[in-house]
Amino acid sequence: LIDIPIYAQTDLDEIYRIISKVNEEAVPEHPEILKEPDVLGPQMASNGQFNFRISMIVQGGMQISIYHIFYRLYHEALLREGIELPTLGPLSKGK
């Protein structure tokens, strides 16, 4: 699973478009991806952060490598298209 933090007011249609474009261009270059990525869309993490989630099925042992490659591709494409992404700070443990 790849979770990209997003703001609640982000244009989801635009994110779907950008993610789909990245997948069309990059997935064919990675035969270790066994099935077309499943774009699950917006999710809420337990800490209240909104994320945009993409699921991929890949060859065994390739999960971490593909995660890092595609997280970077998605992140760069979203920023290039003017989508603002939050930067998460350290989470408070509370008192």
Region annotations inferred by a language model:
Residues 1-95:
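Structured, soluble regulatory/oligomerization domains located on the cytosolic or IMS-facing side
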